[in-house]
Amino acid sequence: MALQPASGVRDLNPQQVQRNHELREALAAVYRLWGYEEVAPPRIERMDTLKAGGAIDSRDIVRLVADEPLGLRPEMTASIARAACTRFQNRRRPLRLWSHGTVFEGRQADEGGLCIEEKLHCGVELFGARGVEAELELLSLLMASFKALALPLSEPPQLLIGHTGLMQLLLKNVDEQDHPAYRNCLTQLDRLALRELINTQPQHAHLQQWLDRRGAPDAVISQLKDAFPDAPVLQQLTRLINHLSPLAETTGISLQLDPTFQPMYALYDGIVFQLVCRGTSSPVVVARGGRYDTVVQRLGARGKDATGLGFSFCVDDLRDLPGAFAMTTSRTDRILLCYSQNSSMEQALQAQAGLHRRGLSCQVDHHPCETKAEAEERLREAGCNSLEWVGD
């Protein structure tokens, strides 16, 4: 019999589960305030849904052995978008939904086998919202949600913002057949590969400068406007940054704009972003999101409301940030109920029911005690902080 969990997954102790619940409820309270309604997408989906029309590589999906192609969800956006385009298609737009649940990310382990990473996520999706107004709401909600967590971080988190339209600007003079090669070099910051491409196409040497042009949004937008005047995407980003800057300052978040930033999954076709915190040994992405209109359209939505955008926090990664676990985890008063040899388990259960009716947490020790002093010794062993004695 196997005594260890599968590669990539782990058991959570009661304190970790409680902390996950606290973080999830803190996020959910903000989502509800903003008018978002909870949904529960399935963990198992058809592969064509999980791949989001080719936006997610099938190698990132954990497949199930079944009569039809099924898999475990690597993220929740595709499942919720499917529901929004089918079961919820007649509901009024904008449609605001939030969800929480486990996602399963498949990756190649060091020894060559499949490693499944199981993570708890909690996020929102906004359907049928057009224009920069939708991005204004979504990123404002991200800020408000993170602020509600009140995490004691030693360094300010960084909100990294990109836009697929910026990459299109950078590559607008590159032959379309060469876009994938140049895009990979820029997004992966691969200077050597980019230099090799430029050696054969020297007219694109200017692309090298964009590998180093990331940082304060105002400065980056100014550089982009010099290179690409009157680009509509820059006007949208300017409006977005002007709104976010004061919010970021009050929330303690640093903003960074990167024209070459592209997310892990190719879901997005507009604004993209990720929130990065300092972890124990390296930076940790605790939230990511963006706009995914194309995915919604591939799932059958049509017309002006065929839009979608959202974000998701990784609750497990939030919990594991330095100081985040110990700060707000509260200890609930727990009562240990012990009974003497002259009493019975039935009497102890009746006494426990009375405490439960008062809303008190109480557990019964199944074995009678010879003395109350013995019960007090069991109290320390049980991890409870008060004793209820049934006896003489």
Curated annotation (Swiss-Prot):
The keyword Cytoplasm applies. InterPro entries: aa-tRNA-synth_II/BPL/LPL, HisRS-like_core, HisRS/HisZ, HisZ. It comes from the Bacteria. One of its GO terms (molecular function) is histidine-tRNA ligase activity. It is found in: Cytoplasm. Keywords: Amino-acid biosynthesis, Cytoplasm, Histidine biosynthesis. Pathway: Amino-acid biosynthesis; L-histidine biosynthesis; L-histidine from 5-phospho-alpha-D-ribose 1-diphosphate: step 1/9. GO terms for biological process: histidyl-tRNA aminoacylation; L-histidine biosynthetic process. GO terms for cellular component: cytoplasm. Belongs to the class-II aminoacyl-tRNA synthetase family. HisZ subfamily. Required for the first step of histidine biosynthesis. May allow the feedback regulation of ATP phosphoribosyltransferase activity by histidine. This function is generally fulfilled by the C-terminal part of HisG, which is missing in some bacteria such as this one. Heteromultimer composed of HisG and HisZ subunits. PANTHER family: HISTIDINE--TRNA LIGASE, MITOCHONDRIAL-RELATED, HISTIDYL-TRNA SYNTHETASE. This is ATP phosphoribosyltransferase regulatory subunit. It comes from Synechococcus sp. (strain WH7803). The lineage of its organism: Bacteria, Bacillati, Cyanobacteriota, Cyanophyceae, Synechococcales.
